[in-house]
Design a protein with these regions (language model features):
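A glycine-rich, Thr/Ser-enriched phosphate-binding loop motif common to dinucleotide/cofactor-binding enzymes
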Residues: 1-15, 27-35
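Generic hydrophobic/aromatic pocket-lining and core-packing "Φ" positions
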Residues: 13, 37, 57, 97-100, ...
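Adenosine-nucleotide cofactor-binding segment
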Residues: 20-29, 41-99
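Short glycine-centered segments of the SAM/dcSAM-binding site in methyltransferase folds
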Residues: 23, 108-109, 133
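C-terminal hydrophobic helical "lid"/dimerization subdomain
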Residues: 52, 142-192
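Helix-to-beta-strand junctions that scaffold the AdoMet/dcAdoMet cofactor pocket
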Residues: 104-106
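Rossmann-fold NAD(P)-binding glycine/threonine-rich loop
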Residues: 114-131, 137, 142-151
Length: 192
């Protein structure tokens, strides 16, 4: 679980050389998003969490995010139009990419690592107006995985999980469907 969570966010941030002087928005603060915040902060980027859930602000700040924006608050969202260099999109629910593309500055990159069940609908002018890019990331290899593990060990970066007994798997599923998990459930193999 740690490898999946970490690699899906580490690899694109490294590929696009996100770091000091960059403004990174992490869209969604769940299993992938919380690792994206940790990596973004450790790479030296200014990290903002974009979330539909205002109750996640305290978690975002605890993880090191510099800013937090509730995406349902149109005025707050407008205040960051054209602001970000990168958006790392970890959301697996359907959402409007055009809205988030407007938050990118010139040459900004929106990187999708979440996988919604329906296709994205994107207007051409959401991209061409500012020479913006829409990208995805799900690749890497053993050398990069080892690099990530070494980096995490050196910087004390770990995934936040809740360990559960196998007998509680149905309760964990119900909680997951309600969005009540910080940030992944892991089954204690000793409980099998």
């Amino acid at each position: 679980m740690f490898l999946e969570l970490s690699f899906l966010t580490y690899s694109p941030l490294r590929h696009w050389k996100v770091g000091k002087g960059h403004k990174l928005a992490v869209l969604g603060l769940g299993g992938l998003g919380h690792m994206a915040v940790k990596f973004g902060v450790s790479f030296g980027a200014e990290v903002t969490v974009l979330s539909t859930s205002p109750e996640k602000e305290a978690d975002a700040k605890k993880l090191g995010a510099h800013k937090f924006i509730v995406t349902k608050d149109e005025e707050h969202l407008k205040s960051v139009t054209g602001y970000f260099d990168f958006i790392l999109d970890t959301v697996s629910a359907p959402h409007d990419l055009n809205l988030y593309l407007s938050l990118l500055g010139v040459n900004g990159v929106h990187i999708c690592v979440g996988a919604p069940p329906t296709p994205y609908q994107t207007h051409a002018f959401s991209l061409i107006g500012g020479r913006k890019s829409l990208a995805g990331s799900l690749i890497g290899g053993l050398p990069e995985t080892q690099e990530m593990l070494d980096y995490c060990a050196e910087h004390h970066i770990v995934s936040d999980i809740e360990m559960i007994d196998i007998k509680n798997v149905h309760e964990a599923y119900d909680r997951m469907m309600k969005g009540d998990v910080r940030y992944r459930f892991v089954i204690d193999m000793a409980s099998l």
